[in-house]
Amino acid sequence: MQIRMDKENRELKAHGSYEFPVNISYEQLSRYERGSFSWHWHPEIELTFVLSGQIGYQVNGKSYVLKDGDGIFCNTNALHSGHMIDGMDCVYISTTFAPRFLYGFSNSMIQTRYVEPVLTDMQLASIVFSPEIDWQNQVLACMHR
């Protein structure tokens, strides 16, 4: 299996529907060709929570090693990929959603004041969450529910 993309590496998979723009999936790196998924991007936000194993995760040129209990926020339009480490499998939950799921209506106060500043900040292409940091562990608990 591999991610279907267009010529610009935009993922072609629908992440939910217009009525409910959210997709939650149970993923396993060994299901992908060579234990990795290709560089791709999408206009949705993606949250990844590692259930077991480790994943080498890259976002816009930054590399991370995520292990059991870690998570990552991958911003809209960020180019990202992932691969097995030392041939060991990784199981994770991927939650992908359209930003409008957070703000509802275009040009709402929530969109303009809170969501858009995060989506357009080039320094926030990704944020790693570790269970060792209290506030991040609270975020991870929500991601794992």
Q: Can you say where each PLM-predicted feature lies in the sequence?
A:
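A hydrophobic/aromatic-rich effector-binding and dimerization subdomain
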Residues: Q2-N23, T76-H144
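Generic protein-terminus/edge-of-domain signal
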Residues: M1-K67, G71, N77-A78, T112, ...
